[in-house]
Amino acid sequence: MVQNVDVFICGSGSAGICAATWLARYGITCKIVDSRSGPLKVGQADGVQCRTVEVFDSFGIAEELLRESYHVLEVTFWSSDGKGGIIRSSRAPDRENGLSHQPHVILNQARINALLLDAMKRFNGQEVDYGYTVKDVQVDSAKASDPEAYCVTVTTEKDGTEEVFKAKYVLVSAIQNAPRNISHFV
């Protein structure tokens, strides 16, 4: 059976989840799949830039992010002391005055993603479907200019069972493990 979805998102890393959360905020449902067995447990990138905190503010979750994170106020630069040790060579404010009303913060990426997943679910009940492998993506170029057409066919596999989705739009945020033909469309 073929399922129609407006937006199909391959990958539930930070980019995929952020895009899905934006869509959910505006009432657009999507199918978001990931090959992992569940949400990220250990972070791979924990720094959150000021502008990203602004995005979280637009989702209504900046307060929680700011409460849980370490705030970066200044940076320190270190150099070799010439004897096998290090010495502090300089310190500087972390961000330029007037850059943003939000700070630069540090929080485990798994927790950052969890904040986004919670917001996405709160906005429209949407969740990530884990354990999927995207096997193929095909675009019907004859229908691609019609914004109402489900012109992309995405073939997936989960637990040995093939599932096919027709989508108006596909967002690929996990190119590392994607089928070769996906990179043609990125």
Predicted feature locations:
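Beta1/beta-strand and adjacent pyrophosphate-binding region of the FAD-binding site
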Residues: V2-A15
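Conserved structural-core and active-site-/substrate-pathway-adjacent residues in large, well-folded domains
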Residues: I9, A20, F56, N113-L116, ...
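Conserved Rossmann-like nucleotide-cofactor binding loop
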Residues: A15, G38, N177
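A short, Lys/Arg-enriched amphipathic alpha-helix followed by its capping loop at the start of a domain
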Residues: C18-I28, R122-F123, Y169
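Glycine-rich FAD pyrophosphate-binding loop
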Residues: A24-A45
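Active-site-adjacent segment of FAD-dependent monooxygenases/related oxidoreductases
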Residues: K41-R122, D129, Q138-P147
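Conserved beta-strand-loop-beta-strand element in the redox core of flavoprotein oxidoreductases
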Residues: Q138-K166, V170
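Flavin (primarily FAD) binding-site architecture
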Residues: V172-V186
